Amino acid sequence: MKLEGGKEVAKIIKAIKDSGVPVMGHLGLLPQTAEKYSVQAKKSEDAVNLIQDAKILEESGAFSIVLEMVTSDVTEIITKSVKVPTIGIGSGINCDGQVLVVHDMLGIFEKIKPKFAKRYLNLSEEIRNAVNSYVNDVKEKRFPDKEHTFSMEKDELEKLEKKIV
């Protein structure tokens, strides 16, 4: 399970962990509640709060902490300050691991491209071409063909035809 938030979710993390369910913390940009997507911990006081929150999440029993859109400098400090692995998304190279949303990595959305997401493929174009091919095949009666269709055995079809005549 992954919970977004800092000290305000610490007791919840502890309770869930104590019941036997592993919990991953999530700090920085909190996409489930964010009103706007912006880089986190650009100011020193915000950075101090985030570092404290990371330590609190670790103390509460989080097995790992996602750091989303946190400045690389603060990510490095947090990673050195906690013993649990940090996983970055848009937070630079200083985390113990990295994650990307597969839609961003594969270029599924043409117009949505977060600055921190490297596109390894442009699937939006391939998807558009595939859908256009499908539509054309349906219009031209090339799909579905025999390969993609189920049929009755010939003798059963003959029996059916006799029953409905």
Model-found features: residue ranges?
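Alpha/beta enzyme core
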Residues: 1-165
